[in-house]
Amino acid sequence: MENGVLKAPAFYISYLLKKNRIEYYDRMSEVRRSGSYEQWIKFFLRVIYESAQDAVETINLLTALHNQSIALIGEPSRVTQTLLTVFHYLETNPIIEIGKTAEALSLSYNAVARAVELLIGKGILAQTDKQGRTRIFSYKAYLVILCKDT
């Protein structure tokens, strides 16, 4: 993150610590009781390793989904720049509203609405909710990958 390669943490140790919280507490108690740090360090290193493995798997799945979605969108020469802009925005904001997306991307409401309809037609985006006149859309396949095991 310091060198600008990552914009956010790529793996989450806290998830695995919570998942294994009984073992976590047992090992911490053992450190307090006997001063045995080695077993704690081995446990923590295992958690880091598993978290890194999970991050690599998630990155691979997201990369494959990106490539699959780009293939569905079509050749860049046959696709509007707005469509690609909205698609790339979806990869950092997988739940959107047309108005807020238009504002965030400095595009017209109608241009974003057309891109959203095209993405729905290609099976990339789906309407998930409607709050009054505001429709909410999500990149469901992306969210499934990000939310696995939660």
Predicted features and spans:
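Generic recognition of stable, solvent-exposed alpha-helical segments in well-folded globular domains
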Residues: 19, 23, 36-43, 81, ...
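Short acidic, hydrophobic short linear motifs in intrinsically disordered regions
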Residues: 92-105
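Basic amphipathic alpha-helical segments that dock to polyanions
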Residues: 90, 112-122, 137
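Phosphate/pyrophosphate-binding active-site loops
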Residues: 1-60
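Short alpha-helical segments that sit at the start of domains
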Residues: 56-87
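Short, cationic-aromatic polyanion-contact patches
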Residues: 79-80, 127-150
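Short conserved micro-motifs at the rims of enzyme active sites and ligand-binding pockets
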Residues: 56, 99, 148-150
